[in-house]
Curated annotation (Swiss-Prot):
Activated by phosphorylation. HAMAP family: GlmM_B. Mg(2+) binds at residues 100, 241, 243, 245. The active site is at 100 (phosphoserine intermediate). GO terms for biological process: carbohydrate metabolic process; peptidoglycan biosynthetic process; UDP-N-acetylglucosamine biosynthetic process. Binds 1 Mg(2+) ion per subunit. Its EC number is 5.4.2.10. Belongs to the phosphohexose mutase family. It is an enzyme of class 5 (isomerase). Keywords: Isomerase, Magnesium, Metal-binding, Phosphoprotein. This is Phosphoglucosamine mutase. GO terms for molecular function: magnesium ion binding; phosphoglucosamine mutase activity; phosphomannomutase activity. It holds the Pfam family PGM_PMM_IV.
Amino acid sequence: MGRMFGTDGVRGIANKELTADLAYKLGKAGAFILTEGTHRPKILVGMDTRISGDMLESALVAGILSVGAEAICVGVIPTPAIAYLTRKYNADAGVVISASHNPVEYNGIKFFNKNGYKLSDELEDSIQALIRDDFKDVPVLTGENIGRKIEEDGEAIRDYIDFAKSTIKGDLKGLKVALDCANGASYITSVEAFKELGAEVHVINNKPDGININRNSGSTHPEDLMEYVVKNNCHMGLAFDGDADRCLAIDEKGNLINGDFILAICGKELKKQGRLKKNTIVVTVMSNLGLDIAMKKEEINTIKTKVGDRYVLEEMLKNDYAIGGEQSGHIIFSDYNTTGDGLVTALQLAHIVKESGKTFSELCSIMKELPQVLVNAKVSNDQKDIYLKDEEIKSEIDTITKNLDGSGRVLIRPSGTEPLVRVMLEGENQKEIDKLAHGLAKLIENKVK
């Protein structure tokens, strides 16, 4: 059995890879491992709008109840809401059934511990080991020891909306905002929060039917929103993904504003308020060099981690930083939540736009994005580290780096899933870096022939 858990829980095609049987086992093992020693543990269960959610929820909950835990089912709700509410309700764990930005046929199961954090690799391995060993030493409960399912009646959504609203001071009156909910989990929460704060709210893709989640919509397909913002003279647009743990933005001219720009704008604002701990933002190695240059001018440090919001969060927790995130729009505000939170990000950004008295595009001029080129070089899995060993490749990387002279960079990343390495170059001249990236990729491929 290979490793069941990926970077964001267990994910696969629902009913084929992520079956009801597997969901039952994950519920049983997760509840047992996460609540050991607790008399009558409580586990919060939420999901996005996928058609397979009902099937997987039924199986997952059956597993939870079989080991004597209570399952509190809150229905369709954003992933970050489960992270927050697990803490607020003093639950012993939280589970979300969602495949985030993936197409409808996929689904996933993701656990949070009692503090609202994603699980460590060690805990995930313990859950997998229990399933692999066929629940050896797990007692079979009967009678009054079996757990109960509790259907929650909307209080959870209300509590999450109130929490998200509380993260900004004042209101959003006078702001005209377009929201794209991706026909996903934020179709109620995001719309209500913005309306209650006084914004003029226009919404697209907020009619989920079980199969239209992420379809040509949301943060992975923002084209319709870009058009809508311009056509309707909105001050800004905000696009969520299926489980609303990420958010991208659109300026009033219809330009897509990615996570790097959001981090730059929010980082500068936090510093102004004296809330940017250690004057540092945490980003990944894939963030644009333009962000580093912009932050240097603002006397803000950038610390880089491996790709993945879990690594960003690890770094933030280790050194008590206030903000971090990825280009994809996973932004973590550690003062507010324990994971990327699309609605909290959207509200911070909207509030900054309103209070600044500037247009969104003016705020975005804080940063100039450098041209970026990504080229794949095909290599076998056992030769993915050749760029670290081969002298000619190392020398070529050094030469390119020297020639870019601080206004560009080379980054090589082995793929975690395919037999290739990704060659990424950034610099001021698109044509030049294009040529250099393709040349370097070719050199790597020639060396492994």
